[in-house]
Amino acid sequence: MNFADNLNSIQQRIRAACQRAGRDENSVMLLAVSKTHPAEMIQEAVRAGQTFFGESKIQEAKAKIPNCPGKARWHFIGHLQSNKVRDAVELFEMIQSVDSLNLSREISKRCQQAAKTMPILMEVNVAGEASKFGYQPEQLLAELKEINALPKIEIHGLMAIPPYTTEPEKAR
Protein backbone atom coordinates (compact mmCIF):
# COMPACT_ATOMS: atom_id res chain seq x y z
CA MET A 1 0.00 0.00 0.00
CA ASN A 2 1.42 3.42 -0.95
CA PHE A 3 1.14 6.63 1.07
CA ALA A 4 -1.91 7.91 -0.83
CA ASP A 5 -3.79 4.67 -0.13
CA ASN A 6 -2.81 4.77 3.56
CA LEU A 7 -3.85 8.42 3.83
CA ASN A 8 -7.20 7.70 2.19
CA SER A 9 -7.81 4.80 4.59
CA ILE A 10 -7.02 6.97 7.63
CA GLN A 11 -9.23 9.79 6.35
CA GLN A 12 -12.12 7.35 5.92
CA ARG A 13 -11.66 6.16 9.51
CA ILE A 14 -11.63 9.78 10.73
CA ARG A 15 -14.82 10.52 8.77
CA ALA A 16 -16.55 7.46 10.24
CA ALA A 17 -15.45 8.32 13.79
CA CYS A 18 -16.67 11.90 13.37
CA GLN A 19 -20.03 10.70 12.09
CA ARG A 20 -20.40 8.38 15.09
CA ALA A 21 -19.50 11.22 17.45
CA GLY A 22 -21.62 13.84 15.70
CA ARG A 23 -18.52 15.91 15.06
CA ASP A 24 -17.57 17.94 11.99
CA GLU A 25 -14.74 16.08 10.27
CA ASN A 26 -13.19 19.43 9.27
CA SER A 27 -12.52 20.09 12.96
CA VAL A 28 -10.00 17.21 13.02
CA MET A 29 -6.41 17.81 11.97
CA LEU A 30 -4.36 14.81 10.89
CA LEU A 31 -0.75 15.47 11.89
CA ALA A 32 1.69 13.08 10.21
CA VAL A 33 4.73 12.43 12.38
CA SER A 34 7.57 12.83 9.92
CA LYS A 35 10.55 12.33 12.21
CA THR A 36 13.18 9.97 10.79
CA HIS A 37 11.52 10.10 7.34
CA PRO A 38 13.45 11.72 4.47
CA ALA A 39 12.31 14.84 2.63
CA GLU A 40 11.40 12.75 -0.43
CA MET A 41 8.83 10.84 1.62
CA ILE A 42 7.37 14.11 2.95
CA GLN A 43 7.09 15.41 -0.61
CA GLU A 44 5.21 12.22 -1.57
CA ALA A 45 2.87 12.75 1.37
CA VAL A 46 2.20 16.35 0.31
CA ARG A 47 1.43 15.21 -3.24
CA ALA A 48 -1.05 12.72 -1.75
CA GLY A 49 -2.81 15.53 0.13
CA GLN A 50 -1.23 15.49 3.60
CA THR A 51 -0.62 19.02 4.87
CA PHE A 52 0.41 18.94 8.54
CA PHE A 53 3.65 17.35 9.73
CA GLY A 54 5.16 16.97 13.20
CA GLU A 55 8.86 16.93 13.98
CA SER A 56 10.38 16.23 17.38
CA LYS A 57 14.03 17.13 16.81
CA ILE A 58 15.19 20.63 15.87
CA GLN A 59 18.36 19.49 14.07
CA GLU A 60 16.44 17.05 11.88
CA ALA A 61 13.82 19.71 11.12
CA LYS A 62 16.48 22.26 10.16
CA ALA A 63 17.83 19.85 7.57
CA LYS A 64 14.45 18.62 6.31
CA ILE A 65 12.05 21.56 6.20
CA PRO A 66 13.96 23.63 3.60
CA ASN A 67 13.82 20.60 1.29
CA CYS A 68 10.03 20.35 1.60
CA PRO A 69 8.66 23.56 0.10
CA GLY A 70 5.05 23.93 -0.85
CA LYS A 71 1.94 23.13 1.13
CA ALA A 72 3.63 21.38 4.06
CA ARG A 73 2.90 22.98 7.43
CA TRP A 74 5.08 22.12 10.41
CA HIS A 75 4.42 21.62 14.12
CA PHE A 76 7.02 20.89 16.78
CA ILE A 77 5.94 17.89 18.86
CA GLY A 78 9.00 16.92 20.91
CA HIS A 79 10.60 18.10 24.11
CA LEU A 80 11.89 21.62 23.45
CA GLN A 81 15.02 22.84 25.19
CA SER A 82 15.30 26.57 25.83
CA ASN A 83 18.47 26.84 23.75
CA LYS A 84 16.54 25.55 20.69
CA VAL A 85 13.58 27.93 20.95
CA ARG A 86 14.97 30.45 18.43
CA ASP A 87 15.14 27.74 15.77
CA ALA A 88 11.71 26.39 16.72
CA VAL A 89 10.14 29.84 16.33
CA GLU A 90 11.76 30.19 12.92
CA LEU A 91 10.82 26.72 11.62
CA PHE A 92 7.39 25.89 13.02
CA GLU A 93 3.87 27.32 13.00
CA MET A 94 2.91 25.65 16.28
CA ILE A 95 4.72 24.22 19.29
CA GLN A 96 2.71 21.37 20.79
CA SER A 97 4.90 20.54 23.78
CA VAL A 98 5.24 23.55 26.09
CA ASP A 99 5.98 22.10 29.51
CA SER A 100 7.13 24.95 31.75
CA LEU A 101 6.71 28.62 32.57
CA ASN A 102 10.36 29.26 31.71
CA LEU A 103 9.91 27.69 28.27
CA SER A 104 6.77 29.79 27.73
CA ARG A 105 8.72 32.93 28.61
CA GLU A 106 11.53 32.02 26.22
CA ILE A 107 9.09 31.33 23.37
CA SER A 108 7.40 34.67 24.04
CA LYS A 109 10.76 36.47 24.02
CA ARG A 110 11.89 34.85 20.76
CA CYS A 111 8.52 35.48 19.11
CA GLN A 112 8.71 39.16 20.04
CA GLN A 113 12.16 39.34 18.42
CA ALA A 114 10.83 37.61 15.30
CA ALA A 115 7.58 39.65 15.22
CA LYS A 116 5.66 36.39 15.11
CA THR A 117 2.79 35.01 17.18
CA MET A 118 3.15 31.33 18.07
CA PRO A 119 0.19 29.07 18.83
CA ILE A 120 1.13 26.60 21.56
CA LEU A 121 -0.26 23.54 23.29
CA MET A 122 0.49 23.02 26.96
CA GLU A 123 1.90 19.54 27.57
CA VAL A 124 0.29 17.84 30.55
CA ASN A 125 1.69 14.69 32.15
CA VAL A 126 -1.68 13.09 32.89
CA ALA A 127 -0.12 9.79 33.91
CA GLY A 128 2.16 11.39 36.48
CA GLU A 129 5.05 9.37 35.07
CA ALA A 130 8.46 10.66 36.17
CA SER A 131 10.00 9.56 32.87
CA LYS A 132 7.66 11.82 30.85
CA PHE A 133 7.80 15.56 30.29
CA GLY A 134 4.88 17.86 30.90
CA TYR A 135 3.10 19.83 33.56
CA GLN A 136 1.43 18.20 36.49
CA PRO A 137 -2.19 19.39 36.18
CA GLU A 138 -2.10 21.41 39.43
CA GLN A 139 1.14 23.14 38.42
CA LEU A 140 -0.29 24.16 35.05
CA LEU A 141 -3.40 25.61 36.68
CA ALA A 142 -1.20 27.66 39.03
CA GLU A 143 0.88 29.12 36.15
CA LEU A 144 -1.73 29.39 33.40
CA LYS A 145 -2.74 32.99 34.10
CA GLU A 146 0.86 34.18 33.84
CA ILE A 147 1.51 32.16 30.67
CA ASN A 148 -1.69 33.43 29.09
CA ALA A 149 -0.56 37.02 29.66
CA LEU A 150 2.75 36.56 27.81
CA PRO A 151 2.94 38.45 24.51
CA LYS A 152 3.19 36.73 21.14
CA ILE A 153 2.04 33.30 22.28
CA GLU A 154 -1.49 31.93 22.09
CA ILE A 155 -2.56 28.90 24.09
CA HIS A 156 -4.65 26.74 21.77
CA GLY A 157 -5.15 23.81 24.11
CA LEU A 158 -3.53 20.87 25.81
CA MET A 159 -1.35 18.02 24.63
CA ALA A 160 -1.46 14.91 26.77
CA ILE A 161 -0.32 11.36 26.20
CA PRO A 162 -2.07 8.88 28.47
CA PRO A 163 -0.22 5.93 29.97
CA TYR A 164 -0.03 2.82 27.83
CA THR A 165 -2.85 0.36 28.37
CA THR A 166 -4.22 -2.58 26.43
CA GLU A 167 -7.73 -1.25 27.09
CA PRO A 168 -8.37 1.87 24.96
CA GLU A 169 -11.23 3.10 27.16
CA LYS A 170 -8.82 3.49 30.08
CA ALA A 171 -6.75 5.92 28.01
CA ARG A 172 -9.65 8.33 27.41
Model regions and ranges:
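Conserved alpha/beta-domain cores
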Residues: 1-172
